């Protein structure tokens, strides 16, 4: 999809861009694959705020996505490419030969009318899902499982992908977009290709109101709060932090502090850590 620019008729529109949705072929979602999505405004079941900056936004319905791709041996035709308000990637509606309908994440260059399949004997072409042991070295993949049968967890957002680097015993080496090289069980599944809608990261929101439509509330700096609200708060005028390093609102070191647990079971599966920026 290409980016759409707007005439600067107001300050909010001056640098605003949006996607032209040229890839979208159908605007009404499949009713049988919809679920209600009530608003939580960042609160848990006790009504306590657990996630800041959430609230408001346009009404949404959840689209049930097939991350497992476990319907083997039955061909599926791509019926339409659709917009999903709950994720950055577009979604594709598949209609299987037996009549079942499922949504999947739409890979780049997927076209309406294409026939997809999943399983050990599927062809190596965009949109097909296979166990990693049957995917050739060098192939670009997305929607990668970490545990067999759990469903894809890695490389699911717009433009995301990973690459198969090699095979060692029961593991397959995968290079992620972060530069991390990781071993994943060869029985885990992945989908061929890169996730579509790659221009998503280039969109300029342009104005605060557009963030509110998405359900994103303002982020207030800690330095302008009172000392009872934030460790950076208080002082006369524009006071410095007054601490050795920046702190989160709960008094924990942040901005550069590593938060990964020291001895995590999956550490032994990471061959090379992610690249430092």
Curated annotation (Swiss-Prot):
Q: Which PANTHER family match?
A: LARGE RIBOSOMAL SUBUNIT PROTEIN UL2M, RIBOSOMAL PROTEIN L2
Tell me one GO biological process term: cytoplasmic translation
Q: Which PROSITE patterns match?
A: RIBOSOMAL_L2 (PS00467)
* Region listing for Disordered, in residue ranges: 36-55, 213-277
Assembly, in brief, is:
Part of the 50S ribosomal subunit. Forms a bridge to the 30S subunit in the 70S ribosome.
Q: Name one Pfam family in it.
A: Ribosomal_L2_C
Task: Supply one GO CC term from the record.
Answer: large ribosomal subunit
Stated name of the protein:
Large ribosomal subunit protein uL2
Under InterPro entries, the record lists: NA-bd_OB-fold, Rib_uL2_dom2, Ribosomal_uL2, Ribosomal_uL2_bac/org-type, Ribosomal_uL2_C, Ribosomal_uL2_CS, Ribosomal_uL2_dom3, Ribosomal_uL2_RNA-bd_dom
Q: Does the keyword Kinase apply?
A: no
> Which function does this protein serve?
One of the primary rRNA binding proteins. Required for association of the 30S and 50S subunits to form the 70S ribosome, for tRNA binding and peptide bond formation. It has been suggested to have peptidyltransferase activity; this is somewhat controversial. Makes several contacts with the 16S rRNA in the 70S ribosome.
Ordered alphabetically, the record's keywords are: Ribonucleoprotein, Ribosomal protein, RNA-binding, rRNA-binding
Cited SUPFAM superfamilies: Nucleic acid-binding proteins (SSF50249), Translation proteins SH3-like domain (SSF50104)
HAMAP family assigned: Ribosomal_uL2_B
GO molecular function list: rRNA binding; structural constituent of ribosome; transferase activity
Question: Would you identify the family this protein belongs to, as annotated?
Answer: Belongs to the universal ribosomal protein uL2 family.
| Keyword DNA-binding appears in the UniProt entry | no
């Amino acid at each position: 999809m290409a980016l759409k620019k707007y005439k600067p008729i107001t300050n909010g529109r001056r640098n605003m861009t949006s996607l032209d949705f040229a890839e979208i072929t159908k605007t009404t979602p499949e009713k049988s694959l919809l679920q209600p999505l009530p608003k939580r405004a960042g609160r848990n079941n006790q009504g306590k705020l657990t996630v800041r900056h959430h609230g408001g936004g346009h009404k949404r319905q959840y689209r049930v996505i097939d991350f497992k791709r476990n319907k083997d041996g039955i061909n599926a035709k791509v019926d339409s490419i659709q917009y999903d308000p709950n994720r950055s990637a577009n979604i594709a509606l598949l209609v299987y030969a037996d009549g079942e309908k499922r949504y999947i994440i739409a890979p780049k260059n997927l076209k309406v009318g294409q026939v997809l399949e999943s399983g050990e004997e599927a062809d190596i072409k965009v949109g097909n899902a296979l166990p990693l042991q049957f995917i050739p070295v060098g192939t670009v993949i997305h929607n990668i499982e970490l545990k067999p049968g759990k469903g894809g967890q890695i490389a699911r957002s717009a433009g995301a992908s990973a690459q198969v680097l090699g095979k060692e015993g029961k593991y397959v080496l995968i290079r992620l977009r972060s530069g991390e090289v990781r071993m994943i069980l060869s029985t885990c599944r992945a989908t061929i290709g890169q996730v579509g809608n790659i221009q998503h990261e280039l969109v300029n929101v342009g104005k605060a109101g557009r963030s509110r439509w998405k359900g994103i509330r303002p982020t207030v700096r800690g330095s302008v709060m009172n000392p009872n609200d934030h460790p950076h708060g208080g002082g006369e005028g524009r006071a410095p932090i007054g601490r050795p390093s920046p702190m989160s609102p709960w008094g924990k070191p942040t901005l550069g502090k590593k938060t990964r647990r020291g001895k995590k079971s999956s550490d032994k599966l990471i061959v090379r850590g992610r690249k430092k920026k």
